[in-house]
Regions:
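Tandem repeat scaffolds
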Residues: 4-176
Length: 176
């Protein structure tokens, strides 16, 4: 089995994804943490069970990518176009998906605690079995899928989070 550097793997992913997928099948504990994939077009790549912790996919176009069981802790997906990708059983804690289009994706058993979904388009994505979605950060501009693709009793209404807390002296009290 060949050993590749992160830079060589990045080139494989970008230029010959099928060779990366073949190599990955014979590899254990693939570490692509802190890799900058920004602005890449990534299609049909198998990142299942890969450590992608703190990597950046900002401004990427990702289609049919398999993130099953991947460690996506603190990954940057800002402004990415993510279509038909599988995030099942992955860890998205602390990931920033602001301004991303994440459509037709599967988030079954995906841990979304602390995931930033500000102005994220999640149209037609399946969040019905996502874990800790109520601990994600989102705003009134987040576009959610239909109710049947959401967890039962999840409130999509924008709510204040810790970043919007105000000190008591900041609150104006009217005089009587």
């Amino acid at each position: 089995m060949l050993d590749y550097t992160k830079e060589e793997l990045l080139s494989l992913i970008e230029n010959t994804p099928e060779r990366f997928n073949e190599w990955k099948m014979d590899s254990d504990d693939v570490d692509l943490s802190e890799v900058d994939f920004s602005n890449m077009v990534i299609r049909e790549v198998d990142f299942s069970d890969v450590d992608l912790n703190s990597s950046s996919f900002s401004d990427c176009n990702l289609t049919l990518v398999n993130f099953y069981g991947a460690d996506l802790t603190a990954v940057d997906f800002t402004r990415a176009v993510v279509t038909e990708c599988d995030f099942s059983e992955s860890v998205l804690t602390g990931a920033d998906c602001s301004y991303a289009e994440m459509t037709y994706c599967n988030f079954t058993d995906c841990d979304m605690a602390g995931t930033v979904l500000s102005e994220t388009n999640l149209t037609s994505s399946d969040l019905s079995a996502a874990e800790n979605l109520s601990s994600a950060r989102y705003d009134s501009d987040t576009i959610w899928p239909d109710d049947d693709m959401m967890p039962n009793e999840f409130d999509t209404a924008c709510r204040d989070d810790l970043s919007s807390l105000k000190d008591d002296e900041d609150v104006m009290v009217e005089d009587y």
